[in-house]
Amino acid sequence: MDIQPTNQSDKHASKGVVLVAFGKPQYYWAAYNLAYSIKRFNKVLQIALICDSQERATYYCHDLTNVIDVYVELPEQHIYTNKKLDPGKAKVLLYDYLPYHNNLYLDVDAVCLKDLQPLIDQLIENNAEYATHVVGEHTIDKGRDFKQMQWAWADQLWQHFGLVKSDKIYAINSSIQFIQKCEKAEAIYRMAADMYINNPMPLNKLRMKWGGGQPDELYFNVSFGKNKFKPYEVNAICFQMNREFTFSQIEEQFYLMSYYGGKGFTPTFYTDWLDRKLKAWMQEDGIQHKYFIHRITDHKHADPKR
């Protein structure tokens, strides 16, 4: 990796966006669309791609070479479990592969709508050692149904992972995470990874699986509780299952628009809009928009329909 050493006296010294793509070619396509849109607004902002193989990624999407600054390769054992693709494992093991001191991690199923530099700088200024999209919080006295967390019943989490009555867990959407290389963020990741690998919740006890497998978010949620840690909240991505916002409202209020979940989760009203934006931007740059979102969502690691 061609990374300049971090100057610890300058908290802004090492910062960048981190994307992850491996397995299916469509994830490299999504990574390209997102990276292109980020560079559209800020050409000097560093973007790292954590992938299974730089050679494989650029073979299936040569355009990545125009938008990615740093490649970091994951070992196969951190991508697969019993020869099956395991994205959740890669996400809980992400910490050791982060190339910057201040890392804005983004799931690749999104398009950037404005310059991300102010967001990153604000998170650094606020000393947000770990920040993410928080959707709810829960203590066991509130009952077993943690409505904002779809993965498991609360009482089963408390029992399986040895949480105590005073523990509070936070439900997150891990599509966005700001991660400083520091003791607190490392502790969150280490515990989440240990539970995921060595003490996972049995799949048959999950209320909902992620693409047929383990959801990384569940293990982060529990790790917050066991570490007595409240994540810093960042509301920078628009997630939509219904037509709640106009296009102009999204552009005014958010940095990015996600097309999360499987085919049909995000209305085509929005995904078609994102494709139109990508096409128009690329036409201005004299290139062709090839990686249409519907070609990506058909192959995502997610539940097949809403």
Go through each PLM region and give its residues:
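A structural signal for short coil/turn segments at secondary-structure junctions
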Residues: 42, 98-99, 127, 227
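Short loop segments at secondary-structure junctions
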Residues: 54, 98-100, 180-184
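Conserved donor-nucleotide/metal-binding helix-loop-beta segment in metal-dependent transferases, i.e.
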Residues: 114-153
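Catalytic core and acceptor-binding pocket of nucleotide-sugar-dependent glycosyltransferases
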Residues: 162-264
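N-terminal anchoring/stem segment of glycosyltransferases
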Residues: 1-79, 211-214, 226, 260-265, ...
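A conserved donor-nucleotide-binding helix/loop in the catalytic core
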Residues: 33, 74-106, 113-122, 257
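Short, charged, surface-exposed secondary-structure boundary motifs
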Residues: 77-85, 139-145, 265-269
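A structural signal for well-ordered alpha-helical segments within the folded catalytic domains
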Residues: 29-32, 36, 89, 93, ...
